[in-house]
């Protein structure tokens, strides 16, 4: 075999060996990197982290949620492939609002929050069409939300609750994680009506230990 051909083979073999070594080094470094810092957000709640501001009232808390939710909804251009993810971000925002308000949220408050995101009932939205149909029909039909009149209200008001499918697919822990990331602090600092117990404290502690306190959207 000519010397030139042997020399090229040796160089190619050496380059291949260097590439393998580089990949091993990169894999080793990646394994040492905390998951929160190394993984691109892939679920609705992972896109949200809110600014530090006064949330001493439910109205201010919902305002912070609206601002953080807008980050999720405009994180990247909407295409066919990520439209469903955007809709999931909208749903998670509503579920979180219901949670922090004590397991139910009046329709007026929901639309006040969504109004800050440019969504009004009956008015066409560039992404969702009629947002009221998405929220009160699609999410209700699919079992994520319950939408019913407030007892003894006059004039009649409506309120939202978690639907059965939300309880199965979006556990309390997941929504507490969402809230913790929005506020970038322990979930129980929110001025909500939820009755905390020791199990909840343990869950929030686990969230904070997993990196929720220091996480932020990229």
Curated annotation (Swiss-Prot):
Stretches with biased composition (Low complexity): 61-71
Residue spans of biased composition, Basic residues class: 1-13
Record domain MAGE: where: 1-197
Source superkingdom: Eukaryota
Cellular component annotations (GO), alphabetically ordered: nucleus
Gene3D superfamilies named among the record's database cross-references: MAGE homology domain, winged helix WH2 motif
Modified residues (Phosphotyrosine): 194
Keyword annotations from UniProtKB, A to Z: Phosphoprotein, Tumor antigen
PANTHER family: MELANOMA-ASSOCIATED ANTIGEN H1, MELANOMA-ASSOCIATED ANTIGEN MAGE ANTIGEN
Protein's name according to its UniProt entry: Melanoma-associated antigen H1
Gene: Mageh1
């Amino acid at each position: 075999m000519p010397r030139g051909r042997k020399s090229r083979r040796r160089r190619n073999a050496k380059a291949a060996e260097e590439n393998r070594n580089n990949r091993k080094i990169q894999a080793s470094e990646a394994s040492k990197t905390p998951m929160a810092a190394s993984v691109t957000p892939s679920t609705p709640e992972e896109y949200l982290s809110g600014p530090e501001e006064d949330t001493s009232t439910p109205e201010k808390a919902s305002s912070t949620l609206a601002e953080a939710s807008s980050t999720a909804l405009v994180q990247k251009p909407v295409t066919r492939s990520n439209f469903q993810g955007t809709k999931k971000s909208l749903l998670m925002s509503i579920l979180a609002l219901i949670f922090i308000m004590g397991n139910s949220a009046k329709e007026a408050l929901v639309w006040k929050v969504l109004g800050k995101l440019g969504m009004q009932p009956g008015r066409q939205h560039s992404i969702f069409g009629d947002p009221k149909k998405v929220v009160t029909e699609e999410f209700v039909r699919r079992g994520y939300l319950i939408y019913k009149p407030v007892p003894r209200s006059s004039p009649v008001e409506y309120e939202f609750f978690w639907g059965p499918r939300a309880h199965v697919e979006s556990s309390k822990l997941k929504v507490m994680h969402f809230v913790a990331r929005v506020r970038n602090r322990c979930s129980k600092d929110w001025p909500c009506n939820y009755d905390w117990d020791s199990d909840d404290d343990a869950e929030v502690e686990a969230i904070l230990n997993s990196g929720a306190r220091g996480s932020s959207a990229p």
